[in-house]
Regions:
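Nucleotide 5′-phosphate-binding alpha/beta core
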Residues: 1-34, 43-46
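Conserved AMP-binding A3 loop
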Residues: 30-59, 66
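Conserved S/T- and glycine-rich ATP-binding loop of Class I adenylate-forming
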Residues: 37-40, 71, 86, 124, ...
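Gly/Ser/Thr-rich phosphate-binding loop
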Residues: 136-188, 198
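Conserved ATP/PPi-binding loop(s) of AMP-dependent carboxylate-activating enzymes
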Residues: 191, 200-228, 260-262
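AMP-binding/adenylate-forming catalytic core of the ANL superfamily
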Residues: 209, 236-324
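AMP-binding/adenylate-forming catalytic domain of the ANL superfamily
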Residues: 321-342
Length: 357
């Protein structure tokens, strides 16, 4: 972390990014780590993180959570969320307890792993799918309830999962951030100390501050780092009068239907309140009349029959405009994922045999 060694490039066993990121070629002396992004298309990019950015993120996290402690590593150590567990542990002078997730998230191992953390302040970081799985097991849920905080990132956590966590006594902290910001930089809608947030005229979220990466390895055009000190994300959001950020979704996930814009996240939140829907994803499909129509893929809850499209539309229209109600529905056993905790919407489009536009 002193900036004098070679920059590290953490990758999974099947990651094809190293060649694209020019491994072995010259890089700025202050770059400690190059973390590949999990974009769905195009050439892999690498967020160039300095030791200063990594430590600023870790220190700000501990300040927000109430102090350093011991961490349970339950995410891949080649993703930024797992990397930050290691950095936080290093700065705290502790050794993390590792839960092997190479073959999946085994909730049966969770209670003993939490016990191994010992006394004092104890934390972990998960994605929403891991949290949901743990909450279905009483022993795993009780183990999480014994932690001082469970950070949730990798995408928004469904409201039913957050409600279940609250009932189980699990202190969930919702995080927003990415590799380009050295991990989560906004906790429960509030920026960490030093982090700057603004929403531009087009609704796009921009982030700044000491946790920011020093640009990309293999920078795209246009470069979201082009404005000094800022990173323009692909996310749409709003900031309320209290300075709390709400992330509405990704700009490329927006559905243009009949001249109106529909963001998938509110529709997904409405669908998840239907008793027969265990999980879902919403996306746009090409439509000759509307431009795009709203489509939904659902995972049916155990013990329930698949709801009809008409029933789902009526359910959504209880809280949202009729434009947001799905016009097409598909049932799957599980949602395809990319990265950690992120639905692969492009795979869903291919699954339906349609096109985006």
């Amino acid at each position: 972390m002193n900036g004098r060694a070679s920059a590290l490039l953490p990758v999974g066993n099947d990651d094809s990014a190293p060649a694209a990121l020019r491994v072995g070629e010259e890089i700025d002396d202050d770059i400690a780590l190059v973390v590949t992004t999990s974009g769905t298309t195009g050439t892999p990019k690498g967020a160039q993180l300095t030791a200063a950015a990594l430590t600023a993120s870790a220190d700000a996290t501990h300040d927000r959570l109430g102090g350093p402690g011991r961490w349970l590593l339950a995410l891949p150590s080649y993703h930024i969320a797992g990397i930050q567990v290691l950095v936080r542990s290093l700065l705290a002078g502790t050794v993390p307890v590792e839960l092997d997730v190479s073959t999946g998230f085994d909730i049966n191992q969770l209670p003993s792993a939490v016990d191994e953390l010992g006394p004092g302040r104890r934390y972990t970081a998960l994605v929403a799918t891991q949290l949901a799985k743990a909450l279905d097991d009483p022993a795993a849920a009780a183990a999480l309830a014994g932690l001082d905080a469970v950070l949730i990132g990798g995408g928004p956590a469904p409201r039913p999962v957050l409600d279940a966590a609250a009932r189980a006594g699990v202190n969930v902290v919702r995080t927003y951030g990415m590799s380009e910001t050295a991990g989560g930089c906004v906790y429960d809608g509030v920026p960490l100390d030093g982090v700057q947030v603004r929403v531009d005229a087009d609704g796009r979220i921009a982030l700044g501050g000491p946790t920011l990466a020093k640009g990309y390895r293999n920078a795209p055009d246009p470069d979201p780092f082009v404005e000094p000190g800022w990173f323009r994300t692909d996310d749409i959001g709003v900031v309320d009068d209290s300075g709390v950020l709400s992330v509405l979704g990704r700009i490329d996930d927006a559905i243009s239907s009949g001249g109106l814009t529909v963001m998938p996240q509110p529709v997904e939140a409405a669908l998840r309140t239907h008793p027969a829907v265990a999980d879902c994803a919403v996306f746009g499909l090409a439509d000759e009349r509307l431009g795009q129509r709203v489509a939904a893929v659902i995972v049916v809850a155990d013990g329930c029959a698949a709801p009809s499209l008409e029933a789902l539309r009526a359910h959504v229209m209880r809280t949202l405009d009729h434009t947001a109600a799905p016009r097409e529905m598909h049932v799957v056993d599980a949602l395809p994922m990319r990265g950690i905790g992120k639905v692969d919407r492009s795979a869903l489009v291919r699954l339906t045999g349609n096109s985006l536009s």
